[in-house]
Every structure is written in structure tokens, then in C-alpha cells.
């Protein structure tokens, strides 16, 4: 079987827990003991090691341009750290803010809107997804 390529939209707390879990339990297979929180060790013939994060997008200036492993532990994230995620080689690209950001985040997240500076220009999301499929 092949890999399941995944793009992360928003490198926040949920993404942090997901990526930590993918790394911590990457050796789990059909014969492994059941892990609390993981409903199935194998699903449709795929294991967690088959999930490959190929792209990540965010609008937070603290995260854009960093490796995903670094962005997931930025100051605005407060998910419990249960696994030290190694450098993934996945740069967080600037996502879209055409409809703004949520009211609960607008006072916490600094968004760079200056397209002439690094991280201020919205990335070519479609192009990135096509290139990394």
C-alpha cells in the first residue's frame, strides 16, 4: 500500500496532538497492543506510519516560515506535549485570510498582511498541494 499524504490547515493545538500521536505511535502495527485513544491499529490496511504530512499552512506570524515541528510548540499553542516531534522538513506556509480570523484569535494571533515581507504574501495553496501530492 502507498502513503496517505496530508496537509495541515492551521498549526494549532489539534494539529499538535495529531502530529505528536503520529510520531509517538508510528511503530504500531496489527500485532501491537491496543493504545488508548487509538480505535484501530490498522484501518483499511493502513497504519499510522503510512500517514505522511507533506504541507502545512497557518496565518500566525509566529508559525509561518518555521518547520512544522517548531510551529506546533509556538507560544499560542497550549496542547499537552507528550512527544518531542523531530524536525519534519515541512515548512509552514502562509495560509489565506480572505475572511479574516476568528474573534477569539484576533487578539492573540499576529497576522502579517504586508505582501512585500516574508510570510505576508498568501502562499499558492493549490500549487503547493499539487506539487506535494
Place the predicted regions along the sequence by residue.
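N-terminal glycine-/serine-/threonine-rich beta1-alpha1-beta2 phosphate-ribose binding loop
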Residues: 1-133
Amino acid at each position: 500500500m502507498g502513503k496517505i499524504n496530508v496537509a495541515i490547515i492551521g498549526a494549532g493545538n489539534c494539529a499538535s496532538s495529531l502530529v505528536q500521536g503520529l510520531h509517538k505511535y508510528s511503530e504500531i502495527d496489527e500485532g501491537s497492543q491496543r493504545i488508548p485513544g487509538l480505535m484501530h491499529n490498522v484501518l483499511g490496511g493502513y497504519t499510522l506510519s503510512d500517514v505522511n504530512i507533506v504541507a502545512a499552512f497557518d496565518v500566525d506570524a509566529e508559525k509561518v516560515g518555521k518547520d512544522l515541528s517548531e510551529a506546533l510548540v509556538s507560544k499560542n499553542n497550549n496542547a499537552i506535549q507528550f512527544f518531542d516531534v523531530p524536525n519534519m522538513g515541512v515548512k509552514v506556509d502562509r495560509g489565506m485570510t480572505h475572511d479574516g480570523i476568528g474573534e477569539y484569535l484576533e487578539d492573540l494571533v499576529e497576522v502579517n498582511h504586508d505582501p512585500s515581507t516574508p510570510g505576508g504574501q498568501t502562499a499558492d495553496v493549490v500549487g503547493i498541494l499539487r506539487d506535494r501530492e
